[in-house]
From Swiss-Prot:
Family: Belongs to the universal ribosomal protein uS2 family.
Any GO CC annotation of this UniProt entry: cytosolic small ribosomal subunit
UniProt xrefs under InterPro entries: Ribosomal_uS2, Ribosomal_uS2_bac/mit/plastid, Ribosomal_uS2_CS, Ribosomal_uS2_flav_dom_sf
Pfam annotation, one family: Ribosomal_S2
Keywords: Ribonucleoprotein, Ribosomal protein
Protein name: Small ribosomal subunit protein uS2
UniProt keyword annotation of Ribosomal protein present: yes
Segments for region (Disordered): 247-277
Organism: Chlamydia pneumoniae
Stored Gene3D superfamilies: Glucose-6-phosphate isomerase like protein, domain 1, Helix hairpin bin
PANTHER family, A to Z: 30S RIBOSOMAL PROTEIN S2 PROKARYOTIC AND ORGANELLAR, SMALL RIBOSOMAL SUBUNIT PROTEIN US2M
Amino acid sequence: MESQSCKLTIKDLMSAGAHFGHQTRRWNPKMKLYIFEEKNGLYIINLAKTLQQLRNALPHIRKVIQDNKTVLFVGTKKQAKCVIREAAIEAGEFFIAERWLGGMLTNMTTIRNSIKTLDKIEKDLSRNQAYLTKKEAALLAKRHQKLLRNLEGIRYMKKAPGLLVVVDPSYEKIAVAEAKKLGIPVLALVDTNCDPTPIDHVIPCNDDSLKSIRLIINVIKENIIEAKHKLGIEIVSPVKSLEVPDLSAFESSQDDESDEENREEDLLAKKFDGEAN
């Protein structure tokens, strides 16, 4: 399978700062294979190997699409979350960009129950707005925002993905562990402080640089889009616009919450959790 969409050069990677690893005292010896040299107290990543590893991984990404499987992008640290979200939406794939909740892969029943709760709250806010007190509406709106923030990118994911694309596997170690437990391959952007052992497709690079992350994730995204176009697969965003009221109207004017408000929110949340099951 020839790679048409890896037009990156070593110069592109260098311009994005992809070659800068961590300080030499913060390295993982298992990354030695991908290190070019030590300079000014930093390890410099071998960008020729970065390019080679990326090119080797692309046919596997396209094979996932050809097999009618999905890709789950995971990147919750601040440098990655916007890039991950944008790329997944453009490619029509799923994503986690805020917080990995334990069991997102290994206990999908619990996650689906949370999604049912989210659906229920949206319906209640849309249909029963006139019957809710301002306080009840505010509590529901807050609960809605919490759930949506964490579940937005996997809300319509019906089964386990065929591939995880991860930025910084040491930061996303729970996601990687769950994927390995289920036999799901992992492609990861891996810095010099990470253990590459559990990763199926190691892309050695600076995983703390926004430019570096964006450059490599965009290549992955473009290959997914290209594979879908060739197969005539429609690209459908994992995030759908929903007919819900403007939730800002329900937001509390105070940033600090009392213990009583927290208790009331929990009670209301339990009520809807129970009705959604």
